[in-house]
From Swiss-Prot:
Domain VOC residue range list: 4-119
Gene name, Swiss-Prot/TrEMBL: fosB
Subunit text: Homodimer.
CDD domains, per the entry: FosB (cd08363)
Cofactor: Mg(2+)
Protein name: Metallothiol transferase FosB
């Protein structure tokens, strides 16, 4: 039986640039760095970076696939400012109802998508139950 997510691994083109992003933007703690890999601890989540220099990376922009991090509403604006100050690629977000809470989407240097989100699963389900009568809930 699956217990939890063990780790998340990202393919990166430039290890130094990626390390800078994960340390400075996501505030992950660098645990080990090799010639072609780096491991981080992000509040108990193991993030691995592995260098793959010659793979296509442009197609990733067409996918909604992303990893969302929970942040508080009080922290949201300061985290957004960190993204702006560090010239992180901020993506246009989708239209949101206030009940959907606050989000900002952005990418790392290799195009992997992330989101800072202030809502919870329960917030989202409650909103959908109130507004999306066509959905089936279990």
């Amino acid at each position: 039986m699956i217990q939890s997510i063990n780790h998340i691994c990202f393919s990166v083109a430039n290890l130094e640039k990626a390390i800078e992003f994960y340390q400075n933007i996501l505030q992950a703690k660098l645990l080990v760095k090799g010639r072609k890999l780096a491991y981080f601890d992000l509040n108990g989540l193991w993030i691995a970076l592995n260098v793959e220099e010659s793979i296509p990376r442009n197609e990733i922009q067409y996918s909604y696939t992303h990893i969302a991090f929970t942040v508080t509403n009080n922290e949201f604006d300061s985290l957004k400012e960190i993204l702006i100050q560090n010239q992180v690629n901020i993506l246009p977000g989708r239209e949101r109802d206030d009940r959907d809470k606050r989000s900002i989407y952005f990418t790392d240097p290799d195009g992997h998508k992330f989101e800072f989100h202030t809502g919870t699963l329960q917030d989202r389900l409650q909103y959908y139950k109130e507004d999306k009568k066509y959905m089936t809930f279990y």
